[in-house]
Every structure is written in structure tokens, then in C-alpha cells.
Amino acid sequence: MARPTGKKFDKRRQQQNPLFKRKKFCRFTAAGVDQIDYKDTETLKDFIGENGKITPARLTGTKAHYQRQLDTAIKRARFLALLPYTDQHKA
């Protein structure tokens, strides 16, 4: 039996998936940020997972230009001990 592939099926499938609800957008583009500052640890913490890894752009919706800046800023903040390297080190 063939799978149904109509618009009605797609809408129903999207409504059932809880991860599909929120549209991804770049927070930095919306705010008009030019440079991401490594000293703004509250913003940087939003882009670090619970295990200490940097969250990829495909999950956060951050544009590539800002993702590179974000990566550098997080690494600088870690080096200066503003952010922890792992989840076991609480800052």
C-alpha cells in the first residue's frame, strides 16, 4: 500500500511533531548585532548544550556568519574561564 502524500497528510504530520512548532531564525540578525562579544556570557550560555558542547547552527537557526563568531566567542570565554568547558565545572 502506498503512503499518502497530500497536503492534508503533511499538515497532520507537522502538527504531531513537537519539534516542528517553532520556526528557526537567527537571533543576532533580528537584533542587528555586528559582533558577538565573548564577555556576554548570558547570551553565550544559550548556545551551549547541557554537556558543554556548542549547539550546531542547524538546531539553533543561527546564520553561518554569526555561528563562526559565536564559536570563537565561546572558545575565548572558555579560555578566560568565563564559561566552563564541561557541565561538571560550574561557573
UniProtKB/Swiss-Prot annotation:
Question: SUPFAM superfamilies given for it?
Answer: Ribosomal protein S18
Q: Do you know which InterPro entries this protein is assigned to?
A: Ribosomal_bS18, Ribosomal_bS18_CS, Ribosomal_bS18_sf
A molecular function (GO) term: small ribosomal subunit rRNA binding
What PROSITE patterns does UniProt report for this protein, alphabetically?
RIBOSOMAL_S18
GO CC entries: cytosolic small ribosomal subunit
Look up the domain of life of the source.
Bacteria
Purpose of the protein: Binds as a heterodimer with protein bS6 to the central domain of the 16S rRNA, where it helps stabilize the platform of the 30S subunit.
Q: Which family does it belong to?
A: Belongs to the bacterial ribosomal protein bS18 family.
Q: State what protein this is by name.
A: Small ribosomal subunit protein bS18
* UniProt organism field: Burkholderia vietnamiensis (strain G4 / LMG 22486)
Taxonomy of origin reads:
Bacteria, Pseudomonadati, Pseudomonadota, Betaproteobacteria, Burkholderiales
Gene assigned in the entry: rpsR
